[in-house]
């Protein structure tokens, strides 16, 4: 099984690309945000635990997120591997993910990072706000903060993965199809 991390700042298109890449390479797209919401909506034991934590305004602990991902991996059959979107968010989470994968005879094979010019990110987010009606994508100050937070949080993970030879920057400029081709070219070397 092959496992990819996909990263990119807000507006980089990682969600759009993840869906297409997962389909092309028969990977299970694991979006932790979607998984958290689904567990809570389904009222599972894990969902109840997370709902209680979140209702107090606290972050879901790493071990709970890892438990949720491990459950998904353990119950996924017929997939060539996994595409992690939105996780890990810290070096500690990266280490926990590696440990959990190692226990299953797997590893992180590559960290794909979409690189997009700042002005293009802002343009994409504003355009997305027009379509989605998300007010936070219309406010330039909020956009700037989201991009800054991404850089601050992701840089240590990039450095960690780079030291392990896993970091692969990918040009995220151009059309959706152009970016998809570039990502696919990197991934097909490992799948």
Report each predicted region and the residues it spans:
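Glycine-rich phosphate-binding loop of ATP-dependent small-molecule kinases
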Residues: 1-191
């Amino acid at each position: 099984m092959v496992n990819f991390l996909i990263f990119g700042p807000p507006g980089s298109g990682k969600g759009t690309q993840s869906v297409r890449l997962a389909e092309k390479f028969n990977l299970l797209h694991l979006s932790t945000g979607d998984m958290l919401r689904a567990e809570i909506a389904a009222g599972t034991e894990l969902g109840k635990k997370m709902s209680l934590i979140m209702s107090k305004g606290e972050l879901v602990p790493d071990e709970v997120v890892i438990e949720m991902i491990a459950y998904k991996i353990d119950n996924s059959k017929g997939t060539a591997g996994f595409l992690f979107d939105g996780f890990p968010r810290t070096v500690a989470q990266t280490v926990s993910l590696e440990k959990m994968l190692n226990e299953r005879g797997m590893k992180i094979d590559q960290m794909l990072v979409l690189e997009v010019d700042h002005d293009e990110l802002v343009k994409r987010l504003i355009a997305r706000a027009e379509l989605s009606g998300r007010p936070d994508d219309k406010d330039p100050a909020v956009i700037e903060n989201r991009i800054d937070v991404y850089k601050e949080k992701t840089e240590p993970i990039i450095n960690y993965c780079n030291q392990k030879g896993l970091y692969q920057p990918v040009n995220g400029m151009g059309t959706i199809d152009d970016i998809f081709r570039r990502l696919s070219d990197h991934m097909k070397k490992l799948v």
